[in-house]
Amino acid sequence: MLCPFCNHGELKVIDSRNSPEANAIKRRRECLRCSQRFTTFETVELTIQVLKRDGRYENFQEAKLINGLKAASSHTRIGQEQVQAIASNIKQDLLGKQNREISTKEIGELVMKYLKKADMIAYIRFACVYRRFRDVGELMEVLLSATPDGEK
């Protein structure tokens, strides 16, 4: 690591502690040349491979997950903080799995699980895109399953 002020490579760690953010360590560092201090955050990087519908593999991209959640939850009572929390919960669920290869189907089901708890409109919007309904009957099944006791 280089000093962001003078690009010198010799630094010393002054303080280390757990960060309020999940799975991160916050470190205060000091450059041995210019004596400037700065903060770094260290996180564990665990790569999750996503198996796409066409058989390709792609690295998991949290930004794609967040964009999908934002699209489904726009104009609902779900705010930006809740979108971030849902994305974080889904990522933690994925990291908790033994297998580092996850299908888009598994990710979609997790998204639907969390959206169903958070907001039914967002859940239905996501289901319409994710499940690729072929006819109105399939949509009706989701709508009926989303209502308490299948009431009409």
From Swiss-Prot:
Any GO BP:
negative regulation of DNA-templated transcription
Presence of the UniProt keyword ATP-binding in the record:
yes
The cysteines joined by S-S bonds are none
* Molecular function GO terms recorded: ATP binding; DNA binding; zinc ion binding
Name the cofactor(s).
Zn(2+)
State the free-text cofactor note.
Binds 1 zinc ion.
Q: Which UniProt keywords apply?
A: ATP-binding, DNA-binding, Metal-binding, Nucleotide-binding, Repressor, Transcription, Transcription regulation, Zinc, Zinc-finger
Domain ATP-cone, chain residue ranges per copy: 48-138
Translocase as UniProt keyword: no
Where are the zinc-finger regions (unnamed) in this chain?
Answer: 3-34
Q: What does this protein do?
A: Negatively regulates transcription of bacterial ribonucleotide reductase nrd genes and operons by binding to NrdR-boxes.
Entry similarity comment: Belongs to the NrdR family.
Annotated protein name in UniProt: Transcriptional repressor NrdR
Q: Which organism is it from?
A: Chlamydia muridarum (strain MoPn / Nigg)
Q: Output the lineage of the source organism.
A: Bacteria, Pseudomonadati, Chlamydiota, Chlamydiia, Chlamydiales
Tell me the gene name: nrdR
